[in-house]
Amino acid sequence: MRINTVLFDLDGTLINTNELIISSFLHTLNTYYPNQYKREDVLPFIGPSLHDTFSKIDESKVEEMITSYREFNHDHHDELVEEYETVYETVRELKKQGYKVGIVTTKARQTVEMGLQLSKLDEFFDVVVTIDDVEHVKPHPEPLQKALELLDAKPEEALMVGDNHHDIVGGQNAGTKTAAVSWTLKGRAYLEAYKPDFMLDKMSDLLPILSNMNRS
């Protein structure tokens, strides 16, 4: 079966938001729990939804902590977000070759749009599915299924690319092929444990992988 659709996670995959996310968590947690959290403590929080993360810390303060996080994240977005090499060129080439391309993210739409505009990727994507569009987040298959439905694509024709186990397992649950990115903050070995079909050392590795898959 030929691959004609590529779905991407956003944070840590297409754009480097690691410092923004870590700083947003530290700001929020130090506001409510001064001097209790360090950088290494918040690394496991990258990937799950904000609601899932904060509800494990204090269910009574979930909504206000989410508000605090998002306000800081919004205010410091452009100064802390960076690009990854070859991402722009690769997505542009996929679009040029006729692939359907979409984003499946656990982020809110407002900050998704900020990141896409900042990185100039906003012109390429046919579909963007955010946490605002679904009831269940990755690794539940719903977000990927919604993106595939909107793109009129079948799971077996699609590849999911991401930096977190939620992306890889989400792709597996939805029936797509999966590609993990080695630049994940959690380390290459962390993602290899979830057995993605492919491992990318840079985003442009996607192009020969897809070419080979569609040739066989």
UniProtKB/Swiss-Prot annotation:
NCBIfam families: HAD-SF-IA-v1, HAD-SF-IA-v3, HAD-SF-IIIA, PRK13288.1. The gene is ppaX. Gene3D superfamilies: HAD superfamily/HAD-like, Putative phosphatase, domain 2. It catalyses: diphosphate + H2O = 2 phosphate + H(+). One of its GO terms (biological process) is DNA repair. This is Pyrophosphatase PpaX. One of its GO terms (cellular component) is cytosol. Its cofactor is Mg(2+). InterPro entries: HAD-like_hydrolase_sf (IPR050155), HAD-like_sf (IPR036412), HAD-SF_hydro_IA (IPR006439), HAD-SF_hydro_IIIA (IPR006549), HAD_2 (IPR041492), HAD_sf (IPR023214), PGP-like_dom2 (IPR023198), Pyrophosphatase_Ppax (IPR023733). Belongs to the HAD-like hydrolase superfamily. PpaX family. SUPFAM superfamilies: HAD-like. The active site is at residue 9. GO terms for molecular function: inorganic diphosphate phosphatase activity; magnesium ion binding; phosphoglycolate phosphatase activity. Keywords: Hydrolase, Magnesium. Its EC number is 3.6.1.1. Hydrolyzes pyrophosphate formed during P-Ser-HPr dephosphorylation by HPrK/P. Might play a role in controlling the intracellular pyrophosphate pool.
